[in-house]
Amino acid sequence: MKHILFLLTSIALLLSACAPLTKSSNATPSPTPLPQPILDPGYAQDAPSTATPPTDPTPFDPAPVSSGLLPADETNTYWAVNPSSGSRLFVRVAYPRAWNGELVPALVLVPGGTGATEPRKAEALAAEGFLVIIFDPEGRGRSEGTEDYNGFIGQDGLAAVIEAATALPGLDANRYGLVSYSYGVTLATGALARHPDLPIDFYIDWEGPVDRTYTTTGCGANRAGGIQWQACSNESWWAEREALNFIAEVRVPYQRIQSQTDHVQPTNNHAIDIVNAAVAGGVPWVRLNEYPAGQTYDATNQPAMLPDSMDKQIDRTVATYARYIIETVVNQ
């Protein structure tokens, strides 16, 4: 009997020695994700906003720009985070064809209407020697969120893209411009006015509608284009979406590009309106096309605008004006 008990005990010891070890609970933890880029919530305090307020109202410094852009799924594509909505905004970057790693002038392009990124424009301006940043505004293209029609939330998103993009290799922060097309003027002027510390050196506006009358092409029942569904009597809605509300607060050189025949409007009065408002508001340098800077104009006796053929060369015109402003205004 003793021999049997001894044999059973020996077998039990052998089985326990061969059993797999229990996995330690002290395994190396997964790396902590990098913080999402956040901008100073104080940016949105200059005017009432429909944006969701930050959960922590305590003031804090902006996140380091090195964490500002998160890589997306293609080469030279990224995500920036809109601090007002938490939405990820899709960003694409185009470099000059012969870029060798040196610092080059940069442009952020704001699309017209309720459009998204336009890679063709980016490539055309990159061919002119610029590093070009394009993006899908809130709720458009590949970006998250809900369409904001260039209101405060959209403006905060543009500000986040501008700030975050300063981390891009090759971007010269001393030659960094903003370019808007058509209704993009609302997004651009709102971002510059409400975020006065943005690292933008100059602003170029192509034929932007400057208030609700132009944006709706007349505010009447038979509107020809623009935002058809929003009543012009909705003061709170339009207060966020009229460039004339913001232009006087812009503190960088401003260039207006205007063709003789506007791409939407029946007159060019809107160009006169915004240039005059910019000069009256003390914008540091204001120019209409190639006329002397600082001039104001009479809408009933307008100067000749650019020939309509220039619309087919708009990318080259933007590049020419950007180089002129950099060389004669920004770097002086």
Which residue stretches match the model-derived regions?
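Ser/Thr-rich, Proline-interspersed low-complexity disordered segments
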Residues: 13, 18-70, 221
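N-terminal cap/lid segment of alpha/beta-hydrolase-fold proteins
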Residues: 48-100
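Short beta-strand element of the alpha/beta-hydrolase
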Residues: 102-112
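Conserved alpha/beta-hydrolase
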Residues: 126-144
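Alpha/beta-hydrolase active-site loop
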Residues: 148-169
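Mobile cap/lid helix-loop segments that gate and shape the active-site cleft of serine hydrolases
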Residues: 201, 208-246
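Short beta-strand/loop motif that positions the catalytic acidic residue
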Residues: 250, 256-259
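C-terminal catalytic histidine-bearing segment of alpha/beta-hydrolase fold enzymes
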Residues: 281-332
